[in-house]
C-alpha cells in the first residue's frame, strides 16, 4: 500500500466509530426475531398450521386470495356477515400483499397452501423485529446514534403488548402498523428539518425554482408516500394525518407569532398531504366515509389538511400585509378551526358524528360499553382489569414497560420545558414550573378532574387531557421549538392518549417510549457531570463518566425488562423471553367441530339439494346487500368466532370480529323464546334472507357468566335489559379478626338467563327442563359508603338448601325474600320449555373441563355456595356444540284425555362423546284429547341424508323411538290408568324438511291393578282441591322424580 493510500485509509478504530451501530443493530434484530419465533413449533399441529386470535385467520383468507389474484386484494366478501356480505376493510391491505408476495417468491410462483400459511405465521415476528429500524432512526435523530441504539435495546426488551402482537402466530395487521407508522413519522421529521433549512416560500413556488425547492419537495413527497403506505396497511391510520394536521396548526401559529415565516412548514404540509390524498384514492373499495374501510374519508381528509396548510400560510401573508398585530393570529386560527368544525357538523352530520365518535373512543378515553367488550379495546388502566389482575395503575404500567415509560415521560416533559428554561427568562421558567405543578395536582388529586368531568358530563381523563393539551399549546406559543421535535412531541402525546384509551395501542406507544428514552440518554450525556454528548475520542472518557452512564442505564433497564420483579398483588412481572411463550389457544378446541361442519353439512349454495355452489375464493363485486343464491345459508354464533367459521368451516357466519352482525347475534342468542329468535333472523336483510340461517354454534364460554355471556348483553337492543337481568354477583365473606375479606365470588342466575336461547341450547340441547327443589339463600349487605347493596352467603354458612318437593321449596322462598329457587349450575328458577326447531348435531371431541378457566369457574361457584364442583357440571360439557335449525317433524296426536298434558321423550346418543341425553317436550290436548307437537330430533332414516344431497350427516342419533305419555291417574281404590304410545318413529326427512307429511300418534289407554295394603291409595292420589280425577299426572310425577335426582346430587355434594 502506498503512503498516499495509507494516509487516507481509515483505521480500525475509525471504522468502528463510524459503523459500530450496524452490527449492534443487526444483532438486536436477530435477537428480537429469535425471541418472537421461539414458539413456532407450537403452531404446527399434526401438519396443520394454526394461528392465535381471530383476525389472523381472516388475513389467511386474504393472503390466499391475493396469491391467486396477485397483486389484487379481495374487493368484497360474501363469505362473512350473512346475509349481507361486506368489504374486507382493514383486511386485504398492503400487509396481505407483502405476505402473499413473499409466499410467491419462496414458492417460485406456485406456493402450496401450507407454505402460504407458514409465510403468514412468521410475518408478525419479522415485522416486529424490523420495527426496530425506524425506531433506531427516529431515536438517532433525537438522541444520536448511541441514543438510537439505546431505544432499539428498549424495544427489544419490552415484554408487553408490542411483543405479544409481534409473536409468531399472531398474524394480525397490528404489528405492521407501528412499522409503517415509524417510517412515516421519520419521513415527516426529515421533511420538516429540510424545509427549516432550505426555507421554501411562495415566491420560489411561483417562480418554479426547482433548484431551490428540490430537497424540500423530494422529502415532502416521500413523507406523503410513507403516510399513504401506512394508511394502506390500516385505514384508521388517518389518525396520523390528524396528528400532523394538529402539529401544522401549532407550528404555523407559533412561527408567525415569533416572527418566522410559517410557509416553510406549510410547504411540507401541502405537498405531503396532497400526495397522501391522491394515493389514498387508489385502494377505495366502497363509496362511503367509514373510518375502518378504504373510502372517501382518507383521501378527502388528507387533502383537507393540505388545503388547511395553504390557507394558514395565506392568512399569515394577509395578516402581515395588513399590519395586524401578530398576537391575534393564533386566536383567529383557533376560531376559524372552530367555525369549520361547526359547519362540518351541520353540512355532513353523519360523517362528523362518525369521525368524532371514533376520535373520542380512540384517544379521548371514551370507549363505549360495546367497544369495551373487546379485550384489546378496553382502557389500559381499566378498573375491572386492574382489580381482576390484582394490580395498581403503576404496577400495570411497570408490567408493560418497566421504568422506561416513566423515563420516557420525563424525556417528554424535558422536551417541552427545555426551550422555556434555557434562555433564563423568569416568566417562561415560571410557566414551566407552574405547568408541572398543575399536572402533578391532576395526578395526585384525581378527584379534581373527576369533579370537573362530572359537572361537564365527560370522562375525567378527557378533562386532564384537555388541560395538559392547553398547557403544551401555551408553551409552544412562548418558545422556539425545532419542527421535528415539536412534531414528535405532538405524536407522542396523541399516541399516549390512544394507548391509555384502548390497550391495543400500546404497540404504538412502545415505539414512542423507546425514542423518548433515546432523547433522554443524549440529554443525560450532555449534563456537565457526565459530559459525554460531544466526545470524539475514547481517551477523553473517564471511568467515572462511564460508570455513571452504565448505572443509570441499568437502573432503567434491569427491573422488569431484564429481571422480573414483584408487582404488588399482581404477581411477578415477565421478561420478553418469558412472555414470548405462546400457542394457538382456543381455536384448536373449535377445529374439530369446524372440520366436521365442512365435511358433514352441505356446501354453501347446495342446502336442500340446490346446485348453486359458491366459489370460496371467487371475485365478487362490491354491493351493500349481496344477493345470495338459493341453497346458501348462515351459521350463527357470537362474533368472536366468525372468522374461524369462514376459514376453518368454509361456511358463512352471521356475525364476525368486524362486529358486523354483533347486535343481531346478541338479540338472537339471548332471545327468550323461539318466536323472538325467528323475528331476529327474518329482520336481517330486505327480503328476510337471514331466515336462511341453518346452524348455531355455542361453546361453553358463551354460556358461562364468568366468560363471554356478559358480552351479548351489552349489544342486545330488543328491550331495555342489562347484565343484572340475567345474573348478579354473590360473595362468600370470611372474617379474619376485625377484617372482612372476600373468600369466594360467583354469580346467581335469574330465570332470564336460563331462558336465553344459547343457554337452552348448550345446557339442555333444546329439551325442556323442570325446576328442582333447590333453594339458594343470601343476605343483603350495604357498602361502607352506603351507595351499593350486594349479596353475600348467609352467616350460618348454608347458602344452598334442598327440599323433598317443589311445594316445600316454593313455600320457603315465599317466606324469605332473600332466597330463590335454583340459579346455580343448570338449575333454573322455573320450568324451561322445549325448543321445537333446534337439535344438537355435533359435540366437540374436547371437553370444557380441559379449560383451566372453566375449572376455576366451577371451583369458585362451588366454594361460594359450599358445594363440590362436580355437582355443577352439566351433562356432556363439550367445549363446542353445533345445532341445526330444522323445520321439525309435525306430530298429530289423539287418544289422550281432554285438556291434559302429553309428554314426548326420546333418548339421544352423542356419537362423539359417547353420552346420552333425553329430549323432552310437552303439549296440551284440546277438548277432544288431540294434540300437536313439532319435534326437532329424528329416530330413523339417517343414512338417507347427508351433504351429498344437501342435508346434514348428524352425529347425534336416537337410541330408540319416541315415547308419548299422557296423564296417569288412580281410579277407585286400585286401578292405575295411563295413556301411552311407545317406540314411535320419526323419519329424518320429516325433521329436515326433505319430506312432507306428519307423524300420527294415538295414545292407548292402559289399566293396571295396584295391589296396596289398606285403602290409602285414593287419599294419596287426591289433589289439593280434593279431586281424584287424574290430577296426579305423569308431568308432575316426572317433575318430582327429576327434582329428587337433582336435589340429591346437590345435597350429596354439599
Curated annotation (Swiss-Prot):
It catalyses: an archaeal dolichyl phosphooligosaccharide + [protein]-L-asparagine = an archaeal dolichyl phosphate + a glycoprotein with the oligosaccharide chain attached by N-beta-D-glycosyl linkage to a protein L-asparagine. Keywords: Cell membrane, Glycosyltransferase, Magnesium, Manganese, Membrane, Metal-binding, Transferase, Transmembrane, Transmembrane helix. Residues 36-118, 163-174, 233-237, 285-295, 353-396, 566-1054 are extracellular. Residues 638-640 are annotated as: Interacts with target acceptor peptide in protein substrate. Gene3D superfamilies: 2.60.40.3390, 3.40.50.12610. Residues 1005-1054 are annotated as: Disordered. Residues 1009-1027 have a biased composition (Acidic residues). The record marks 55, 376, 708 as: Interacts with target acceptor peptide in protein substrate. GO terms for molecular function: glycosyltransferase activity; metal ion binding; oligosaccharyl transferase activity. A motif (TIXE motif) lies at residues 373-376. It holds the Pfam family AglB_L1. GO terms for cellular component: plasma membrane. A glycophospholipid binds at residues 173, 504. It is found in: Cell membrane. It comes from the Archaea. One of its GO terms (biological process) is S-layer organization. A motif (DKi motif) lies at residues 701-712. Residues 1-14, 140-141, 196-215, 255-263, 317-331, 418-485, 528-544 are cytoplasmic. The record marks 165 as: Important for catalytic activity. Its cofactor is Mg(2+); Mn(2+). Belongs to the STT3 family. Oligosaccharyl transferase (OST) that catalyzes the initial transfer of a defined glycan (a hexose-linked tetrasaccharide composed of a hexose, 2 hexuronic acids and a methyl ester of hexuronic acid in H.volcanii) from the lipid carrier dolichol-monophosphate to an asparagine residue within an Asn-X-Ser/Thr consensus motif in nascent polypeptide chains, the first step in protein N-glycosylation. Involved in the assembly of an N-linked pentasaccharide that decorates the S-layer glycoprotein and flagellins. This is Dolichyl-monophosphooligosaccharide--protein glycotransferase AglB. The lineage of its organism: Archaea, Methanobacteriati, Methanobacteriota, Stenosarchaea group, Halobacteria.
Amino acid at each position: 500500500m502506498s503512503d498516499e493510500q495509507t494516509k487516507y485509509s481509515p483505521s480500525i478504530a475509525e471504522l468502528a466509530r463510524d459503523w459500530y451501530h450496524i452490527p449492534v443493530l443487526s444483532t438486536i434484530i436477530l435477537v428480537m426475531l429469535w425471541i418472537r419465533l421461539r414458539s413456532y413449533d407450537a403452531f404446527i399441529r399434526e401438519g396443520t398450521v394454526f394461528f392465535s386470535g381471530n383476525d389472523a385467520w381472516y388475513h389467511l383468507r386474504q393472503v390466499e386470495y391475493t396469491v391467486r389474484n396477485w397483486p389484487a386484494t379481495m374487493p368484497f366478501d360474501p363469505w362473512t356477515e350473512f346475509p349481507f356480505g361486506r368489504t374486507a376493510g382493514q383486511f386485504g391491505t398492503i400487509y396481505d400483499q407483502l405476505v402473499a408476495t413473499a409466499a410467491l417468491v419462496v414458492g417460485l410462483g406456485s406456493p402450496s397452501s401450507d407454505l402460504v400459511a407458514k409465510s403468514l405465521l412468521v410475518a408478525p415476528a419479522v415485522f416486529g423485529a424490523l420495527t426496530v429500524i425506524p425506531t433506531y432512526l427516529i431515536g438517532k435523530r433525537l438522541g444520536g446514534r448511541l441514543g438510537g441504539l439505546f431505544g432499539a435495546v428498549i424495544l427489544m426488551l419490552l415484554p408487553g403488548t408490542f411483543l405479544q402482537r409481534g409473536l409468531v402466530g399472531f398474524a394480525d395487521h397490528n404489528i405492521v402498523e407501528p412499522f409503517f407508522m415509524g417510517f412515516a413519522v421519520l419521513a415527516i421529521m426529515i421533511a420538516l428539518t429540510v424545509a427549516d433549512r432550505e426555507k421554501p416560500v411562495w415566491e420560489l413556488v411561483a417562480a418554479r425554482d426547482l433548484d431551490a425547492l428540490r430537497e424540500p419537495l423530494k422529502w415532502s413527497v416521500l413523507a406523503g408516500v410513507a403516510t399513504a403506505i401506512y394508511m394502506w396497511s390500516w385505514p384508521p391510520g388517518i389518525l396520523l394525518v390528524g396528528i400532523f394536521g394538529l402539529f401544522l396548526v401549532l407550528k404555523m401559529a407559533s412561527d408567525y407569532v415569533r416572527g418566522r415565516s410559517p410557509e416553510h412548514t406549510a410547504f411540507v404540509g401541502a405537498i405531503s398531504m396532497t400526495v397522501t390524498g391522491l394515493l389514498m384514492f387508489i385502494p377505495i373499495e366502497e363509496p362511503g366515509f367509514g373510518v375502518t374501510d378504504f373510502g372517501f374519508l382518507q383521501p378527502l381528509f388528507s387533502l383537507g389538511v393540505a388545503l388547511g396548510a395553504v390557507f394558514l400560510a395565506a392568512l399569515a401573508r394577509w395578516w402581515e400585509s395588513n399590519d395586524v398585530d401578530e398576537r391575534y393570529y393564533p386566536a383567529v386560527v383557533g376560531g376559524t378551526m372552530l367555525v369549520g368544525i361547526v359547519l362540518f357538523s351541520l353540512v355532513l352530520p353523519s360523517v362528523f358524528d362518525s369521525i368524532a365518535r371514533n376520535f373520542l373512543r380512540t384517544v379521548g378515553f371514551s370507549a363505549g360499553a360495546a367497544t369495551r367488550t373487546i379485550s384489546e379495546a378496553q382502557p389500559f388502566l381499566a378498573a375491572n382489569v386492574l382489580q381482576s389482575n390484582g394490580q395498581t395503575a403503576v404496577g400495570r404500567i411497570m408490567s408493560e414497560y418497566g421504568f422506561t415509560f416513566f423515563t420516557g415521560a420525563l424525556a417528554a416533559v424535558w422536551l417541552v420545558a427545555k426551550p422555556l428554561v434555557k434562555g433564563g427568562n423568569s416568566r417562561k421558567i415560571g410557566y414551566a414550573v407552574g405547568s408541572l405543578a398543575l399536572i402533578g395536582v391532576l395526578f395526585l388529586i384525581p378527584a379534581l378532574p373527576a369533579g370537573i368531568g362530572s359537572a361537564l358530563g365527560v370522562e375525567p381523563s378527557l378533562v386532564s387531557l384537555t388541560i395538559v393539551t392547553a398547557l403544551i399549546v401555551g408553551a409552544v406559543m412562548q418558545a422556539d421549538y425545532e419542527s421535528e421535535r415539536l412534531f414528535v412531541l405532538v405524536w407522542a402525546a396523541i399516541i399516549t392518549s390512544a394507548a391509555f384509551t384502548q390497550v391495543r395501542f400500546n404497540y404504538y406507544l412502545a415505539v414512542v417510549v423507546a425514542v423518548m428514552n433515546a432523547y433522554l440518554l443524549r440529554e443525560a450525556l450532555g449534563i456537565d457531570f457526565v459530559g459525554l454528548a460531544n466526545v470524539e475520542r475514547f481517551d477523553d472518557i473517564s471511568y467515572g463518566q462511564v460508570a455513571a452512564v452504565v448505572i443509570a442505564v441499568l437502573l432503567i433497564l434491569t427491573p422488569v425488562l431484564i429481571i422480573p420483579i414483584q408487582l404488588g398483588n399482581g404477581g411477578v412481572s415477565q421478561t420478553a423471553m418469558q412472555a414470548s411463550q405462546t400457542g394457538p389457544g382456543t381455536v384448536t378446541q373449535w377445529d374439530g367441530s369446524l372440520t366436521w361442519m365442512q365435511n358433514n353439512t352441505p356446501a354453501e349454495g347446495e342446502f336442500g339439494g340446490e346446485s348453486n355452489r359458491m366459489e370460496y375464493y371467487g371475485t365478487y363485486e362490491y354491493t351493500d346487500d349481496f344477493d345470495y343464491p338459493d341453497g346458501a345459508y348462515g351459521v350463527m354464533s357470537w362474533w368472536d368466532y366468525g372468522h374461524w367459521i369462514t376459514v376453518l368451516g368454509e361456511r358463512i357466519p352471521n356475525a364476525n370480529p368486524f362486529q358486523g352482525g354483533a347486535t343481531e347475534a346478541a338479540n338472537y342468542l339471548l332471545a327468550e323464546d323461539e318466536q323472538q329468535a325467528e323475528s331476529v333472523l327474518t329482520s336481517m336483510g330486505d327480503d328476510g334472507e337471514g331466515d336462511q340461517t341453518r346452524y348455531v354454534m355455542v361453546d361453553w364460554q358463551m354460556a358461562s357468566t364468568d366468560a363471554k355471556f356478559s358480552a351479548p348483553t351489552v349489544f342486545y337492543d330488543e328491550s331495555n335489559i342489562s347484565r343484572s337481568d340475567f345474573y348478579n354477583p354473590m360473595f362468600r365473606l370470611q372474617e379474619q379478626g376485625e377484617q372482612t375479606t372476600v373468600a369466594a365470588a360467583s354469580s346467581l342466575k335469574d330465570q332470564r338467563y336460563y331462558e336465553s336461547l344459547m343457554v337452552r341450547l348448550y345446557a339442555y340441547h333444546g329439551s325442556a327442563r323442570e325446576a328442582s327443589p333447590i333453594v339458594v339463600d343470601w343476605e343483603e349487605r350495604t357498602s361502607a359508603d352506603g351507595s351499593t347493596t350486594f349479596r353475600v352467603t348467609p352467616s350460618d354458612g348454608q347458602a344452598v338448601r334442598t327440599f323433598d318437593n317443589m311445594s316445600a321449596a316454593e313455600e320457603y322462598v315465599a317466606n324469605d325474600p332473600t332466597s330463590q329457587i335454583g340459579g346455580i349450575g343448570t338449575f333454573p328458577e322455573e320450568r324451561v320449555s322445549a325448543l321445537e326447531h333446534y337439535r344438537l348435531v355435533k359435540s366437540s371431541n374436547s371437553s370444557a373441563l380441559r379449560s383451566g378457566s372453566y375449572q376455576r369457574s366451577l371451583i369458585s361457584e362451588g366454594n361460594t355456595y359450599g358445594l363440590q364442583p362436580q355437582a355443577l357440571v352439566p351433562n356432556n360439557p363439550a367445549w363446542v356444540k353445533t345445532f341445526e335449525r330444522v323445520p321439525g317433524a309435525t306430530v298429530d296426536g289423539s287418544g289422550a284425555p281432554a285438556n291434559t298434558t302429553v309428554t314426548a321423550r326420546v333418548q339421544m346418543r352423542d356419537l362423539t362423546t359417547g353420552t346420552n341425553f333425553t329430549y323432552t317436550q310437552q303439549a296440551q290436548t284440546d277438548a277432544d284429547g288431540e294434540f300437536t307437537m313439532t319435534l326437532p330430533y329424528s329416530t330413523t332414516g339417517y343414512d338417507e341424508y347427508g351433504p351429498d344431497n344437501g342435508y346434514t350427516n348428524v352425529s347425534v342419533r336416537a337410541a330408540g323411538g319416541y315415547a308419548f305419555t299422557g296423564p296417569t291417574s288412580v281410579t277407585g281404590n286400585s286401578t292405575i290408568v295411563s295413556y301411552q304410545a311407545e317406540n314411535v318413529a320419526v323419519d329424518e326427512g320429516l325433521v329436515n324438511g326433505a319430506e312432507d307429511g306428519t307423524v300420527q300418534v294415538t295414545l292407548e289407554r292402559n289399566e293396571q291393578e295396584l295391589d296396596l295394603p289398606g285403602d290409602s291409595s285414593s287419599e294419596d292420589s287426591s289433589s289439593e282441591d280434593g279431586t281424584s280425577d287424574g290430577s296426579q299426572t305423569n308431568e308432575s310425577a316426572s317433575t318430582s322424580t327429576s327434582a329428587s335426582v337433582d336435589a340429591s346430587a346437590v345435597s350429596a355434594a354439599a
